[in-house]
């Protein structure tokens, strides 16, 4: 277990080919990246010591594109953000570039051919991502940048470079509230399992 329990975000393309895995360590309490005293980011192919490995990045979540050909695609920067946002808004596809400048080239964006795509950049990166629209417009059915975060963010939030996942997690979902209750009283999980209880959300 790398660094005592890091997460691996696998990059799998539309054809099901595994390109690599990005290994990152997160703080179990805050959910934030551990960046001190070192970045705590590395790659599976590096850890496996594969010689002459030719890394060709693809979007995180790209393997879902052919499974849901009619769904709108939301593109974010962080792999973690894509995973979290998919919990809150499962009716669209969430994929990640893996970095502010990652995966924005003609080869990788070909995976988005014919799709309706919405870019949701981190705070402070909106202008840079808007500059990607002409390139995306050549292959996507439609491409736009959603700047709702910039419109609603405070100066402090902008200085922190928050992303959509940070805003989504500011309010607990019923599932999150239940998990906190289970953490405080693990016997509750046994009761839920034995009675086959389900969360019922109000319409």
Name what the model sees in each region.
Residues 31, 70-71, 80-203:
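TOPRIM fold recognition
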Residues 2-113:
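Phosphate-handling DNA/RNA-contact segment within nucleic-acid enzymes
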